[in-house]
Structure formats: structure tokens, C-alpha cells
Amino acid sequence: MYCLSEAVIYVNGEFIPKSEAKISVFDEGITHGWAVYEGIRVYEGRILELDAHLNRLYASAKGAGIAIPIEQSEFRRAVLDTVVTNEYRNCHIAPWVGYGELGGEPSVVIRIVERSSRMGEHATSMVSSIRRAAPDSIPAQIKTNSRLDLMLAKIEASLAGVDYAIMLDNVGYVAEASLANIMIVKNGVTLTPYPINALEGVTRNLILRLLPMRGYEAFEDNITLHDLWTCDEAFVCGTGAEVRPIVKVDGRTIGDGETGPVTEKVIQLYTDYIITHGEEVDYSS
């Protein structure tokens, strides 16, 4: 039995109270950031895009040279069991796989925290002085623990008193926000950067699928600073970020400073998708 006053964490096949959960300090995931991870959300007992997240986790691990020691189907069951064990109906789940000690097995950890939704809350931003790592240096499609560029940008945003840092790529185009994808709207058309210097987000891809199904144009494109500063609407999206309108960039008001009509539609489509396509967690199992 577990005391549910604290979260129970999955660690290498066992469920352990958060205060007792541990892995080796010699794990390369800790000593050198040689680890991959995911972020998954549960809303009112519905888990969203679980298989898409696990597909990316296994692809990231392969790209990073980490051999996940369990089959994807077993990992899937472990994620669901983590939710059920904690009895959380609104939460954020973070599967993490570290390379392990040299010569040893990789570590598999599934963290979980209760989290309420911030969907639709206004956010402010700034263009960061930190550039996103070049794709020929650190491939953006590997969701790795070693994301120092993103964290430095996040710190910069925090010190500036804004919610998100918007990072440029090594050429000068908009890449992504700190720990979220970014989309802008110009003349009713939704644009998002190519997934070259930006993570190909699960939420991002979902929005790119949903908008055309409702008659809205949505494309990948190069986005300049001028595009960003002069767009009609902007929003960040991601599993953690959800969908939040960006109402200011570098102190400049985007549109009329309110949630734009396309962004409102995105929030509606995303919320409806959670209800219609979120996988119901069986808490009786």
C-alpha cells in the first residue's frame, strides 16, 4: 500500500514513494545529461496522445544511442499504471530514460505531478539572445535532457518578467519558444516554423491536422522577426504549455492584445479533441 499524500514514482519496474525514489548518481543521464524524456497530460481522466509520445520517446532514444530496456507496450502499461496508482485525474506525466552507468542498463523513470489546466491564459514573451542549437550540432528531434540552450532562454525570460523566450535559429528565423512550439496567424493563415531547429511537437502536429479539417489554412514556413512583430495573432502550444495566446513580444502588443479568433478556434478544437479522442484511464484496474 502507498501513502497517497505524496506521489508514487515508477523506477526501473517498481513503484516507489516520491521521497524514496532514486537512481544511481553515476547514471550518464545525470552526469552528462545523456537521457531522453517526454511530457504527457491527463485531463479529467483522459490521457492524450499517449502512443504519439511513446513513439517519439523511442525514436529519441534510438537517435541518442540509448537502448530502452523494455518493450514499448510494457512502457505504455507502466505509464497507465503510474496514473492509476496515484489516482490522479488531472496530471502531467514525465517518462525519462537515462543511459545508465557505463556498462550497465539504462534507467527508466516515470514521474507524475498533479496539474490543473492553464489553457487559454494570456502570456507575454521576448526574443531571446540565446540561439537554438544548430541541427547539425544537436538534432532538435531528439527530446534530450541536455537542453541548456532552452533553459538559458527560459532564465532570460524569467529575469525579464515575461512568460516565454522566443528563440531564433542559427540563420535568424524564429525556431521555437522556451519549452513550447510557437505559431503565428497572418491574414487568417496559421504558420509555424519548420521542424528543423524546433522540436516537432505532438500538440503542434495535432493543431496542424485539426485546423485544415475545419477549413483553416495552416502551414510550416520560415518566420522572420518582422513576421512575428507584425502578426495578427500568436500562441504557444505544447503538452506542458497547452495553448496560450501570446499577447506581447518585446513589449509590442500582438493584434489587439486579446485572444484572436483563430487562437480561440484552436483552443476549442484542442479542448474538444481531448474529450473525443483522449483515452479514458481505467482506474479500476
Positions of PLM-derived features:
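Short beta-strand micro-motifs enriched in acidic
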Residues: 98-100
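Ordered, amphipathic secondary-structure segments that act as subunit-interaction surfaces
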Residues: 85-96
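Helix-start/capping segments and mature chain N-termini
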Residues: 1-81, 85, 103-285
